[in-house]
């Protein structure tokens, strides 16, 4: 779990749209559980979803996690979305944590099942403590500037 724990950027690609999520993978040694928690932003850096991952299965030999997630979209906060996600991490340098990964998640819309989508994702680790602090505690304008900058540089 130590290979993947930490703060991550996730580029989310769907036909005609790209967005970004900033999230954290936490490992609780006492309960031996992994949790994910993040916020997604559109291409303009506006927040559009909050989500958390649970029931995370780590498959160490494949550098892979599979998880269930639940969340809300800001425009339909009364509607709960959920799904399953999977991420495979690129092999890290010796003695280093993973730095990149890729995968997909399924965004299930129970109110309109025909809108359920599979979304491809790419991950890159964020190790700059200042960026992490700004994303977790900074002003909305700071988060917007960071998300658009990271997405444009991807």
Language-model features: where?
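Central antiparallel beta-sheet cores of small beta-barrel/beta-sandwich binding domains
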Residues: 2-154
């Amino acid at each position: 779990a130590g290979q993947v724990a930490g703060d991550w950027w996730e580029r989310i690609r769907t036909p005609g749209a790209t967005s970004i999520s900033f999230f954290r993978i936490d490992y609780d040694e006492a309960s031996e559980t992994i949790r994910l928690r993040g916020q997604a932003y559109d291409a303009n850096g506006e927040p559009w979803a909050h989500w958390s991952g649970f029931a995370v299965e780590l498959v160490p030999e494949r550098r892979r996690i599979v998880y269930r997630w639940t969340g809300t979209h800001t425009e339909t906060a009364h509607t709960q979305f959920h799904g399953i996600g999977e991420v495979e991490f690129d092999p890290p340098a010796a003695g280093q944590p993973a730095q990149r990964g890729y995968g997909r998640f399924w965004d299930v819309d129970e109110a309109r099942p025909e809108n359920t989508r599979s979304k491809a994702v790419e991950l890159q680790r964020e190790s700059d403590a200042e960026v992490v602090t700004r994303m977790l505690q900074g002003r909305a304008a700071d988060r917007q500037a960071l998300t658009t900058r990271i997405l444009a540089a991807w």
